[in-house]
C-alpha cells in the first residue's frame, strides 16, 4: 500500500525531516497514515519521535509544549498545528528507577476499587508507542525518507480487511478508556468498515 508523497502535508514533512537531521527517529503516525493508505485526505498530521518535548522545543521556535501529565509539542505553521509526541512506553510495563523522586499520579480504578498508578511520560521506543495506541489501524507509522509503513500491530491487514480492532485485549482496552467503544463505532461508520 504505497503512500503518495504529494499527499503529505509539507509542514509535517519539515518537522519529520528536521528531527531526523538532528539525529532523532521521527515518523508520521496514526490517523494521517491510516487515511493516506485509504486514499483519503487526512484532517491533520501527527508526528511521533524519539526526541523529548524539550529537545523538540529546542529545534522549533514555533513550538509550544502543552499538557501536564501527557506532554506534547504543538508546532505552529500559521493557523496549522503539527502535534508532535515523544515515543512512550506502557507505564505498567516499566519499573521506575529506585532514585526517582518524580510524583506519581494515582487514579482510582473503575468498579473494582483497584488503585492504578499512571506515569504518562515514560518514554519508550516506536514499537512500544505503537502498542499504546487504541486500534491497529491507528498504530501505523510512516517513515518518510524510507518511504515505508512500519506496522508493529498488524494494522495493514486490518486496513485491507476493513476491520477496526483494538491493540491488545479489548476487555482491558475498553475498561481503560470506555470512550474507545464510541471511537470504534465512529471509525467503522466514517470509514465504511
Residue ranges and their predicted role:
Residues 1-193:
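Catalytic cores of the polymerase beta-like nucleotidyltransferase superfamily
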Amino acid at each position: 500500500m504505497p503512500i503518495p508523497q504529494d499527499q503529505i502535508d509539507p509542514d509535517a514533512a519539515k518537522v519529520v525531516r528536521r528531527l531526523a537531521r538532528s539525529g532523532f527517529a521521527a515518523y508520521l503516525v496514526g490517523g494521517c497514515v491510516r487515511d493516506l493508505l485509504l486514499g483519503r485526505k487526512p484532517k491533520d498530521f501527527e508526528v511521533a519521535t524519539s526526541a523529548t518535548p524539550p529537545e523538540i522545543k529546542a529545534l522549533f521556535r514555533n513550538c509550544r509544549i502543552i499538557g501536564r501529565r501527557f506532554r506534547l509539542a504543538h508546532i505552529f505553521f500559521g493557523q496549522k498545528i503539527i502535534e508532535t509526541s515523544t515515543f512512550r512506553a506502557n507505564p505498567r510495563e516499566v519499573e521506575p528507577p529506585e532514585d526517582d523522586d518524580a510524583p506519581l499520579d494515582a487514579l482510582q480504578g473503575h468498579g473494582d476499587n483497584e488503585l492504578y498508578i499512571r506515569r504518562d511520560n515514560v518514554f519508550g521506543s516506536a514499537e512500544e508507542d505503537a502498542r499504546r495506541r487504541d486500534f491497529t489501524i491507528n498504530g501505523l507509522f510512516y517513515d518518510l525518507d524510507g518511504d515505508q509503513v512500519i506496522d508493529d500491530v498488524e494494522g495493514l491487514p486490518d486496513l485491507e480487511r476493513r476491520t477496526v480492532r483494538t491493540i491488545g485485549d479489548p476487555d482491558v482496552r475498553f475498561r481503560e478508556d470506555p470512550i474507545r467503544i464510541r471511537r470504534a463505532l465512529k471509525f467503522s461508520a466514517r470509514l465504511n468498515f
